[in-house]
Amino acid sequence: KLVDKSYQLVSLKDIGTPDQEIALLVEEISNRPEFKKIMGQAAEDLTRKEDVASLMTDAMRDAVGGDFAFYNKGGVRLNELRKGEITMEKIYKMEPFSNYIVVHEWNLNKMEDFILKDYNRGKDPGKRYINYYISGGKYEIIRNLQGEGIEVKFYDARGKWLKDKQKKYKIAFSNYVASSNELVKGGEVTDIFITNAIAVYLQ
């Protein structure tokens, strides 16, 4: 039985010397051979978060043979990837949550509903933003004069505007999105961790 609780916000910038015991533990784990294993090579610098997200979502889509993949913006934790070796450590820095892939079969109407409901969450139009990266194509949000999203146009990888509202597409999501978004609940749960999907995709 919980009888009391208390908490205190601590600014990380105010922390001076890190705890020595924890620092040694982090160093020990970081130096494990499995984290140093080279899974692939980056032919050039990926200098934008969007580029790193493209790698992640391409790997998700490829892992399930999907048409599209979506991944939330806040889940991409590596903002850039420099040219050269890509180790498992870097992959875990991209996606440190042990998320796995959940698959849905959706038509364009369901995809549009998914994007618009998320985009229109914020009441202040000036603070609305696109939250989901996509692989397999691109999408465009059409807004009214009040800044509210009213339509989404989806395009395939060749830039063709997709207009068949009844055709279903195989779409990969992370289990985080599937558990936190009412529209994405359910679906086919796979045993494919996103980190493993990235590692396989790079090889």
Feature annotation, model-predicted:
Residues K1-Q203:
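Catalytic centers of hydrolytic enzymes
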